[in-house]
Amino acid sequence: MDFQISAQQREMVASVRSLAQTEFKPNAMRWMDGTFPWENMKKLADLGVLGMSVPEEYGGLGLPILDTALILEEIAKVDYVTAMAVLGEAGVQTRVIARYAPASIRERILPQVVSGDCILAVCMTEPHAGTDVANYRTNARIVGDRVILKGTKTLISRAPEAGMFVVFTRVDGKPGREGIGCVLLEAGTPGFAVTGTYHTMGGENLHEIQFDDCELPLENLVIREDGFRKLLTAFNTQRCLNPSISLGLAEGAFDEAVNYVRERTIFNKPISDFQGIRWKLADMFKDIEAARGLLYRACLTANPFPDPFMAAAAKIFCN
């Protein structure tokens, strides 16, 4: 398998690296209170980064998963909160809309994703079920040409900022995995509310949201049949992109460690001269490179979604 990074990939990564190192890194702590990094997202939109997963016909770059992972990795080296915000625009929710939504929704929403005017949120976790989709209670009831959505989702990223929510739900109360589908809900829909906020150690805020008989057009039910398989297939993308952020965090920590051991002195010499310290750095480097190889290999299996076994292995090791 060829892990060579192309000149085009290097150029894009270099542009993002320059922006991240000069503008994101000095201000990364600003977002640790849960504030959404709108300022950074606008700059990334100007570079085209928010359209990485959007097909070219809607103004995006249509990048392969490896390219997307490389860019997320670069941002995460210096700014975890911004990297997670970008993941929301490049991950499973964008790909569900691009692949399964009707043309009318794709044509309206995807260009706004590219420009940064529409933030996306994926809604999976429920208070009693976690991500165990077979036990979802949120339900989309079909009534004529409308869909009535009722239920609760929790630990949702970007809920106050999002313009559209990709909601995995039961359809017409059908039990088990076979009853899982997906609806698209726009912010401001009557009956929708953000009802709780949980601040995390990483700086992100996560939220609980309620759907109280939200009425939607039937075309917003974008996955009705075989939703569980389609969900897991699409989610394998997330299992590659999320680890790319973990890899970036590890690289950022390694860079800081190397700089520190060169500057910190004991007995009039830098601690980098001590063999015990070098062993620690060698172990860090080894783990980072092993993670990189596993992750890049998983990304390269995408057609259009990554191999589930490789994606799972990469996520376990990197995270």
Task: Outline where the language-model segments fall.
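Short Ser/Thr-interspersed hydrophobic loop/turn segments at strand-loop and sheet-helix junctions
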Residues: 48, 72-76, 169, 185-189, ...
